[in-house]
Amino acid sequence: MDKKTSRLRRATRARKKIQELGVNRLVVHRTPRHTYAQVISPDSQVLAAASTAEKAVTEQLKYTGNVDAAKAVGKTVAERAIEKGVTVVAFDRSGFKYHGRVAALADAAREAGLKF
């Protein structure tokens, strides 16, 4: 089993457990160049989203594939979710380690007011 397949299996397992809870989830995806985050409802509606591919986020950054960029995405997605009335979420790290950019995004979202 290769690295990507293992990550996707971990992600599927975590998503099934979150679906059983029936709560909104903060989903994180990362590539070498960008970081993406979405708040998704239990019925699969995207309530809020942010990424380093957006012009609004990229204007503040020098480079989009680092921890500082992930912090900006976390703050932005949390602010947008709170505007929609979402304050409590489950964190879906999509099988990625809770380290580096994923952890930075989560910490920034917590500081901006999301609870998980």
Swiss-Prot record:
CDD domains the UniProt entry points to: Ribosomal_L18_L5e
GO terms classed as biological process: translation
Keywords: Ribonucleoprotein, Ribosomal protein, RNA-binding, rRNA-binding
GO cellular component terms, A-Z: cytosolic large ribosomal subunit
Record field: transmembrane: none
Gene3D superfamilies linked to this entry: 3.30.420.100
A molecular function GO annotation: structural constituent of ribosome
Task performed by this protein: This is one of the proteins that bind and probably mediate the attachment of the 5S RNA into the large ribosomal subunit, where it forms part of the central protuberance.
Assembly, per entry: Part of the 50S ribosomal subunit; part of the 5S rRNA/L5/L18/L25 subcomplex. Contacts the 5S and 23S rRNAs.
Family, per entry: Belongs to the universal ribosomal protein uL18 family.
PANTHER family from the UniProt entry: 39S RIBOSOMAL PROTEIN L18, MITOCHONDRIAL (PTHR12899), LARGE RIBOSOMAL SUBUNIT PROTEIN UL18M (PTHR12899:SF3)
Protein name per Swiss-Prot or TrEMBL: Large ribosomal subunit protein uL18
